[in-house]
Regions:
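Sec-dependent N-terminal signal peptides
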Residues: 4-15
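Outer-membrane beta-barrel biogenesis signature
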Residues: 18-42, 247, 253-255, 259-260
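Short hydrophobic/aromatic-rich motifs at helix boundaries and adjacent loops
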Residues: 20-21, 42-48, 185-188
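Outer-membrane beta-barrel transmembrane domain signature
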Residues: 25, 115-260
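Transmembrane beta-strand segments that form the barrel wall of outer-membrane beta-barrel proteins
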Residues: 31, 35-67, 72-74, 78, ...
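Gram-negative (and chloroplast) outer-membrane scaffold detector with strong preference
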Residues: 63-151
Length: 260
């Protein structure tokens, strides 16, 4: 039971479901080239929490998992050009502590304890371009690259072959990883929003080199933009070591907004 719970928590944390309907105020804008307002907090239950450092600068991290599996990102807005909003996102991810925790026998074990997990981290860089095809909708395209730094060998038998988690850890076993995708979100009724996106991962140096994730979300936002409830699905396809697999996962989250 603990193993199943640990897997679900990990998948929810990696999944990150967002939607947006407050387009003019730039709330709930993770996954787009827009930054949240200065001094505003958005605290997610399963997703990364975000803070607006300045007009064109925001910081995101997972507070509940920070000491177990830290992942910190900074998004920099570069302004608007010919109707397109441009931004770059830069992050660092440290999975060593988490992988060592699950390297155990019995309940909660995802990796055999016979293997040594070295100190390692990954650095990611992503370019985002957003465009508003309609007044209450945003279309975003993004592309990025992630590469890993390891301070020792990592046995390929230590992979965690689970959807969402595997493609994000694959960079530690192979060459750099490229990602590209599109994100389409907006508002169809006051307080109700939607999101639909597709993300592709291409991993160099291995035959298990392609993963696809498609997410669809409906969301309700409170009148004062202090609470957002999201629910939907995530469809995953990947070329795992055991062969191609499909997975359909639920997506749920509560996000609390503080400040304007």
């Amino acid at each position: 039971m603990k193993k199943i719970l640990l897997c679900l928590i990990g998948i929810f944390i990696f999944t990150g479901a967002f939607s947006q309907d407050s387009l003019t105020s730039h709330y709930w804008t993770d996954g787009t080239a827009f930054n949240i307002p200065k001094h505003r907090w958005e605290l997610g239950l399963f997703t990364a929490s975000r803070y607006g450092i300045g007009k064109n600068l925001e910081l995101s991290a997972h507070p509940l998992m920070f000491f177990l599996m830290p992942q910190v990102k900074i998004k920099v807005g570069w302004g608007e050009f010919s109707g397109f909003r441009l931004a770059t996102e830069h992050g660092i991810f440290y999975p060593t502590q988490f992988m060592r925790l699950v390297a155990t026998k019995g309940t909660g074990g995802l990796i055999s304890p016979e293997f040594t997990i070295p100190q390692m981290f990954a650095i990611s860089n992503r370019f985002l371009a957003s465009y508003k095809p309609f007044k209450k909708a945003v279309l975003t395209a993004h592309a990025g690259i992630t590469f890993a730094v390891k301070f020792g060998p990592l046995d390929k038998r230590t992979t965690i072959d689970l959807p969402v988690i595997y493609p994000r850890l694959a960079v530690f076993y192979n060459e750099p990883e490229f990602d590209a995708g599109v994100d389409f979100r907006g508002q169809f009724f006051p307080r109700f929003g939607w999101l639909f996106n597709v993300e592709n991962f291409i991993i160099c140096g291995t035959r298990n080199n392609y993963f696809l994730e498609n997410k669809g979300v409906l969301a309700y936002t409170s009148k004062k933009e202090t609470l957002r409830i999201e629910a939907g699905y995530k469809l995953c396809f990947g070329k795992y070591p055991a062969g191609p697999q499909w997975h359909l996962l639920p997506v749920i989250d509560l996000i609390f907004g503080i400040g304007r």
